[in-house]
Design a protein with these regions (language model features):
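Nucleotidyltransferase catalytic core that binds NTPs
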Residues: 2-236, 245-249, 278
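Phosphate/ribose-recognition catalytic cores of enzymes acting on nucleotide-derived substrates
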Residues: 226-281
Length: 281
């Protein structure tokens, strides 16, 4: 496995692979890998001749009061997991390499960015779209995989790729969960034992909403109120949002008449956790 930190070297590697007729699969990460990332990496391994995994904690997607400096990092463990998952290359640039002095270009995908996490993190998806566009230009993949746990992020990337005619196939991979249902996240490490118990209410709330939907309930307010009751009864939970939205536009839906996503964000202790479930017949 090769470790590349220079953009020029990364581009050279990918250009050479493409000239040989090889396909490139790409998994972008911020490191501190867990089984959810490993699932993405192993799936990507089957989709290309070469597999590139990026590890880059992107400062421009964090707000001024968010956890950029505290975000967990473990390079040695991440490198081992990438190798065990079959990665050919880890692309791990520095912040200075990605954003040199004078950098000033940003990509905004306004409509799908506005709702959900965009309400409380107004610059987050601008940072996500910008770094992903740069990573695509560095790694030059044919296919890129993203987890569906970050449903809004996936929607933003799909919209950007569509609007800018980026010739990369974007694949969403279902959320990987711990045995008790908690969606895997690097931020789960922030949780104490008691907070982890409270966090299980997120998946329980989504599961109950899904059961109601499958039983015929189409009123989004009923589903939201049900989920809210399950979460608020747990100690230490502060709901940022619970919403039911159109799966493509991410605009709020009152009555569910086509596929929708119930998405939520909840603060528990130091962690802000997100999760979602798609509601479709």
């Amino acid at each position: 496995m090769k470790i590349i930190r220079s953009i020029k070297e990364m581009q050279g590697f990918s250009e050479s692979a493409r000239k040989q007729g090889k396909t490139i699969a790409f998994v972008p990460t911020m490191g501190f890998l867990h089984d959810g990332h490993l699932h993405l990496i192993r799936q990507a391994r089957t989709m290309g001749d070469f597999l590139i995994v990026s590890i880059f904690v992107n400062p421009i997607q964090f707000g001024p009061t968010e956890d950029f400096k505290q975000y967990p990092r473990d390079w040695d463990r991440d490198a081992h997991l990438c190798e065990s998952g079959g990665a050919d290359v880890i692309f791990a640039p520095t912040v200075e390499e990605m954003y040199p002095e004078g950098f000033q270009t940003n990509i905004t995908v306004p409509h799908v960015s506005q709702n959900l996490c965009g309400l409380s993190r107004p610059t987050h998806f601008q940072g996500v779209a910008t770094v992903v566009a740069k990573l695509f230009n560095c790694t030059k993949p044919h296919v890129a995989l993203f987890g569906e746990k970050d449903f809004q992020q996936l929607a933003v990337i799909k919209r950007m790729v569509l609007d800018l005619n980026v010739d990369i196939h974007i694949i969403g991979v279902p959320t990987v969960r711990e045995a008790e249902g908690l969606a895997m996240s690097s931020r789960n490490t922030y949780l104490s034992t008691a907070e982890r118990r409270s966090a299980l209410s997120l998946s329980k709330a989504l599961l109950k909403a899904q059961e109601l939907f499958q039983s015929g309930e189409r009123n989004a307010r009923v589903l939201i109120d049900t989920a809210q009751a399950i979460i608020t009864i747990e100690e230490g939970t502060t709901i940022d949002y619970i919403k039911v939205c159109d799966t493509e536009t991410l605009q709020d839906v009152a009555i569910i008449s086509k596929p929708a996503v119930m998405a939520l964000a909840v603060k528990i202790g130091k962690a802000r956790l997100i999760d979602n479930v798609v509601l479709k017949e």
